């Protein structure tokens, strides 16, 4: 059973990346994170949402991105879900510096950033049916 949970859904406009980042940060604030911890979460969410918009929906603004977040004791689990084009090769996509959109001058560091700032990263994707990125982080909660 979770201590708390939330979900939000928004259209795949790049302007909504900031909204997603702040909404998740506000939800996580109940764990009384440090500035560094909250920035880690915001950065990882930003990368995942940006991936959904740029890669999943190929910058189309007619898709939906869903975020589900759940707090269990001292850990937050955040899922970023899209119904975009999916990822052909997850292992390749997770390699540092790999990008499927070199035409957009993308750095190919999104998954690496998520792995660096979070405690766990899971990616599930099916070509033509979208992608689900799950990131987790534990906090030093003082009772």
Swiss-Prot record:
Key words of the record: ATP-binding, Kinase, Nucleotide-binding, Serine/threonine-protein kinase, Sporulation, Transferase
SMART domains linked to this entry: HATPase_c
EC number in record: 2.7.11.1
A Pfam family hit: HATPase_c_2
GO biological process: asexual sporulation; negative regulation of sporulation resulting in formation of a cellular spore; sporulation resulting in formation of a cellular spore
One example GO MF annotation: sigma factor antagonist activity
Catalytic activity: L-seryl-[protein] + ATP = O-phospho-L-seryl-[protein] + ADP + H(+); L-threonyl-[protein] + ATP = O-phospho-L-threonyl-[protein] + ADP + H(+)
Family matches, as InterPro entries: Anti-sigma-factor_SerPK, Anti-sigma_F, HATPase_C_sf
Source taxon at top rank: Bacteria
Entry-linked HAMAP family: Anti_sigma_F
Family: Belongs to the anti-sigma-factor family.
Stated role: Binds to sigma F and blocks its ability to form an RNA polymerase holoenzyme (E-sigma F). Phosphorylates SpoIIAA on a serine residue. This phosphorylation may enable SpoIIAA to act as an anti-anti-sigma factor that counteracts SpoIIAB and thus releases sigma F from inhibition.
Name this protein carries in UniProt: Anti-sigma F factor
Species classification: Bacteria, Bacillati, Bacillota, Clostridia, Eubacteriales
Gene: spoIIAB
